[in-house]
Amino acid sequence: MSELDAREIIEMIAKAKKKTPIVAYIKGDLAGIDFSSFKFFGDERFGILFGEYEDFKKLLEEHREKIEDYHLEVKARNSALPLADLTKYKARIEPGAIIRDMVEIGEGAVIMMGAVINVGAVIGEGTMIDMNAVVGGRAIIGKKCHIGAGAVIAGVIEPPSAKPVVIEDEVLVGANAVILEGVTVGKGAVVAAGAVVTKDVPPYTVVAGVPARVIKQIDEKTKEKTKIVDELRNLE
């Protein structure tokens, strides 16, 4: 998948038919009711419907006397873009991760519980996005990186002129660190936990603080402490 331009994404969102997907569980005299607007599973007494809220609202109004009870689950409201089809990725994606459509995830990547990845983002092969990390729209993360729990990689869809975050290969971003719009983090760098990165990070350096600054070059001790564990990326 090629890198998405911000204006392309904005145009897609603006022109997309907004959807309010629902799952409805209904009980009653269902014989003779037209469920063609939904994906329907059930019989003449009980059914499960997958479809749009407005269609269900209309169904209720037309057949109120036949429907004895129902339970409604609303998955989103006026949503412009769907979530990704997770089956297309050769990656480990844990329950509770939220991944929008048009996200590229490389083979062997790991997306942990609660991680959020927005439209147009690119996640490289073997990279781990840890729990509750946020990868914003159009952010580009290289291969064999680790994005720590609670970290925020800023997105740049609005304003459309902004440059996306680029994190090169083999970078470790500590827990709760923030990488701001337009920043490039060089290959092999380490961003300390809690750091706020406002400018480019040179390759093979360690940055820390608010705002982040270079505190040292990568040495053997740092390499050992920040080593990527390949076994965690095994899909078999």
Curated annotation (Swiss-Prot):
The keyword Transmembrane helix does not apply. This is 2,3,4,5-tetrahydropyridine-2,6-dicarboxylate N-acetyltransferase. Keywords: Acyltransferase, Amino-acid biosynthesis, Diaminopimelate biosynthesis, Lysine biosynthesis, Repeat, Transferase. Its EC number is 2.3.1.89. HAMAP family: DapH. One of its GO terms (biological process) is lysine biosynthetic process via diaminopimelate. InterPro entries: DapH, DapH_N, Hexapep, Hexapep_transf_CS, Trans_hexapeptide_repeat, Trimer_LpxA-like_sf. It catalyses: (S)-2,3,4,5-tetrahydrodipicolinate + acetyl-CoA + H2O = L-2-acetamido-6-oxoheptanedioate + CoA. It is an enzyme of class 2 (transferase). Disulfide bonds: none annotated. Pfam families: DapH_N (PF08503), Hexapep (PF00132), Hexapep_2 (PF14602). Catalyzes the transfer of an acetyl group from acetyl-CoA to tetrahydrodipicolinate. It comes from Thermotoga maritima (strain ATCC 43589 / DSM 3109 / JCM 10099 / NBRC 100826 / MSB8). Belongs to the transferase hexapeptide repeat family. DapH subfamily. The gene is dapH. Pathway: Amino-acid biosynthesis; L-lysine biosynthesis via DAP pathway; LL-2,6-diaminopimelate from (S)-tetrahydrodipicolinate (acetylase route): step 1/3. Transmembrane segments: none annotated. GO terms for molecular function: tetrahydrodipicolinate N-acetyltransferase activity.
